[in-house]
Regions:
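Domain-level detector of nuclease and nuclease-like folds
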Residues: 35-96
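The −1 position to Zn-ligating cysteines in a subset of zinc-ribbon hairpins
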Residues: 29
Length: 170
């Protein structure tokens, strides 16, 4: 097993010295997020906590009300926003602390690709692929759009699934 990312102490090692050497206290974090988190006492959720259930959902929003090209994947004239309906206080802390909306707006190209795939892989084409490869429809969607049920297992999994669900044909 090889891990190339940074690990962060969930419980501050200077305040909780016994937790400094505990492997269960280490959570994956990008270098920038690790530095940001170390400067605050705001409570965020531990992704390994058995009760972890982030309510954060991503969606797109018109940047220019007259431009609907983005709905077909033809432009990046949209914003990526976080639907804050029913979120927990710890979710809101994460959104604010890590400036998530600003960060995810740098992924418009990824969202645009998902929008195009959602249009290209219509119901008929997905049915064809399911038959050709003898694969379940849910599994096929996971392969096409790059997400897993356990979002912590794959980068951008939550983001990819949320954007896909916004644009897929049923």
């Amino acid at each position: 097993l090889q891990f190339r990312g940074d690990l962060d102490h969930y419980y501050n090692k200077s305040q909780y010295t016994a937790m400094a050497i505990c492997l269960y206290n280490l959570i994956p974090a990008c270098k920038v997020c690790n530095q940001i988190k170390s400067k605050t006492d705001k409570k965020i959720q531990n992704p390994y906590d058995s009760s972890y259930s982030s309510k954060i959902r991503f969606k797109t929003e018109f940047d220019d009300q007259g431009d609907i090209d983005y709905l077909q994947g033809k432009s990046q004239n949209f914003n990526i926003v976080i639907d804050k309906t029913n979120i927990l206080e710890t979710d809101n802390n994460e959104i604010d602390l890590f400036e998530l909306e600003n960060r995810y707006n740098n992924l418009k190209r990824n969202a645009q690709e998902i929008i195009i795939k959602a249009k290209a892989y219509d119901v008929q084409y997905k049915k064809f692929l399911e038959d050709q490869f003898d694969i379940d429809g849910d599994e096929l969607e996971k392969y096409i759009f790059g997400y897993t049920d356990e979002h912590i297992d794959r980068e951008l999994s939550r983001f990819n699934k949320d954007i896909m669900e916004e644009f897929k044909e049923n």
